[in-house]
Each structure stands twice: as structure tokens, then as C-alpha cells.
């Protein structure tokens, strides 16, 4: 059965992660999210307080990114950022893994990094960003297995700032690896309705995009960037 606009909107994290995003742009993001009933807005942690105020009483969540976009900070810093973002009003957290540790074969350190943020989140859902464009398929599977074992809420393809974005092949691989219990978030390059529906068909359950309005109104090409 085809998804209605309302159902499609509930798969979307309406996203603005530009480092120079102004207060006015964050307010407009939130206005659009409330109007179209998106699942959440996804913003940098410094913008969480404003977004939380703008979205109070709307039912739209605020999602904050942590260790973004490089993932190369200390685990303690990532955990602190997650805790502070939640205290400021974030209802979900998207973290970037330690890619250097993964590439160096330090799988235990990668898992410990994820676990530190997961613990800091408590009951708040955690999405773990793999940055799939930089990983081999074996590395993607390894991180997905870690996330499955730790019981995080979602695995996520990309930051939208690195090399490449979400691909159908990566979404399908991630879904096969984590099974039916974890969410899969496709992000980076999902800019129109056809791409969004294809990602959902491949196994995604959430979409990170700056083109949410274009997707749900079927206006064709969406915002450049994320």
C-alpha cells in the first residue's frame, strides 16, 4: 500500500546541520516540521534549546548530533555532549563513531565509544552514524553487529558531510545485519520522494534530509546539501 503524505512525514528527521545556521533558519526549520508533522528536527547540539522552545507542544521531537561530523572526539566528550543535549530538550541523539579507531583495527574501542554515549542517553534513543562512504562492507557489518549487540535504537548511514551519502545497497546491507529490531536511518542525498520511497523499500525506517518539505509535497528536487 502506498504511503500517505502523513505516513511519509513520520519517517523524516527534518535536518539543518550547517555550521552557520542562523536562529531564523532554525525557527523556519521548526515551523516547517510542525506544519508537516515530521517526526523530528535534527540540529547541532547548540541549537537544541531554541528548537525545543519552538517545538514545545507540537509533538515534534528534537534530535541532536554528537561528535559531529568527524566522530574523532573523546568518548567522555561525546557522552557529555549527549547528556547536555538531552537536558536542553533533545529527544533523540545521533552520534558519529570513531572512524580512526575502526580503521586501526581497534574494534573494542569503537564499541566502548558507542557504549559510553548509549549509557549517557539512558532511555533516549541513540542512532549511530557509520559514515558508510568511508567504510568497507566488512567494516559496515562489524559496526552494525556492535550496535545490535549493544541494543542501540538505530544505525545510520552518513553525516552528509563526508564522502558519499546513503545508498540503497548500504541500507539493505545494514538492514540484513541488524535484523528487524533496530531502526535504519538513511541520510545524505535523500532529496526527493522517489529517493525517499526507494530507501524505505530497501529497509530504512527513518530518513535524514533537508528536503522534507519537497518530499512530502512531491515537488521534485529538494534542498541542496543534506
Swiss-Prot record:
* CDD domains given in the database record: DeoC (cd00959)
- The signal peptide stretch is none
Quick one: which pathway?
Carbohydrate degradation; 2-deoxy-D-ribose 1-phosphate degradation; D-glyceraldehyde 3-phosphate and acetaldehyde from 2-deoxy-alpha-D-ribose 1-phosphate: step 2/2
Q: According to its UniProt record, which reaction does this protein catalyse? A: 2-deoxy-D-ribose 5-phosphate = D-glyceraldehyde 3-phosphate + acetaldehyde
> Which terms in the GO cellular component ontology are assigned?
cytoplasm
Gene3D superfamilies the UniProt entry points to: Aldolase class I
Q: What is its main location?
A: cytoplasm
* Cell location: Cytoplasm
Which UniProt keywords are listed? Cytoplasm, Lyase, Schiff base
Under Enzyme Commission nomenclature, its number is 4.1.2.4
Which residues participate directly in catalysis? 94 (proton donor/acceptor), 156 (schiff-base intermediate with acetaldehyde), 185 (proton donor/acceptor)
Q: Name any one GO molecular function.
A: deoxyribose-phosphate aldolase activity
**One annotated GO biological process:** 2-deoxyribose 1-phosphate catabolic process
Q: Which InterPro entries match?
A: Aldolase_TIM (IPR013785), DeoC (IPR011343), DeoC/FbaB/LacD_aldolase (IPR002915), DeoC_typeI (IPR028581)
Q: Which SUPFAM superfamilies match?
A: Aldolase (SSF51569)
> What is the similarity comment for this entry?
Belongs to the DeoC/FbaB aldolase family. DeoC type 1 subfamily.
| Task of the protein | Catalyzes a reversible aldol reaction between acetaldehyde and D-glyceraldehyde 3-phosphate to generate 2-deoxy-D-ribose 5-phosphate.
Official protein name in the record: Deoxyribose-phosphate aldolase
Q: Which organism is it from?
A: Burkholderia cenocepacia (strain HI2424)
